[in-house]
Amino acid sequence: RYGLYMIDEANIESHGMGYGSASLAKDSTWLTAHMDRTHRMYERSKNHPAIVIWSLGNESGNGINFERTYDWLKSVEKNRPVQYERAEENYNTDIYCRMYRSVDVIKDYVSRKDIYRPFILCEYLHAMGNSCGGMKEYWDVFESEPMAQGGCIWDWVDQGLYKSLPGGGEMIAYGGDFGDRPNLKAFCFNGILRSDCLLYTSPSPRD
C-alpha cells in the first residue's frame, strides 16, 4: 500500500570468527568469497526501484576484504550509498550505521562539528516479545536532528516454519518442535510481523 525503502545486504556474516585478527574480513584468502556475494547482490537488485542503500554485510569485522567490496560497489554504483556497520568511521561506509546504540550516543554523534555521514541504526529495538520500549525517545531525536536518520528494527518478520499436526491442520513451529537438539527455542520469534506476515494483534506493530 505504501511501499518500502529497502537496504539490500550482501549475504556475508561471520561474527563467529570475531572482529579481531581472526576475522575473515582481514584474511585475503577470503576475498573471492566476499566479492562473489557482493557481485551477486548487486547484479540481482541493481534495477530494483525499492533498493536505496547497499550493505556490505553484517557483523563480520572490517578489513581488506570489505575495503575491496566497497571500492568495487562504488565503481559501479553512482547514486546509491553503501553502508557497513563494522566500518564504523573508516572510509568504507557512506553512513555511520551502528547497532543497538543508546539515544545519548546518537545525540553525542550528531552534535559533533566534524561529521559528514548521517547516523542510521542498522539494528535497534530487538522486537522479541513485548519489546520496542523507548521508541519515542529514539524518534524524538530522529525527527529533530537532520543527521539522525532512523533505523531498522530487528526483526521485521518472525522466522517460524509451518508444521503439520497429527490430527490435521498446522502450526507455526520453532526450535525443538522438530525434535532438533540443540536449539534456540523461540528465539526465531522476534519480528514485528508473524511468520505468515500477518499482523500480531497484541502487542500490535502500531503500538
Where are these regions (language model features)?
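Extended substrate-binding grooves/exosites of carbohydrate-active enzymes
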Residues: 1-203
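Aromatic-lined ligand-binding clefts that engage carbohydrates, nucleic acids, or primary amines
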Residues: 206
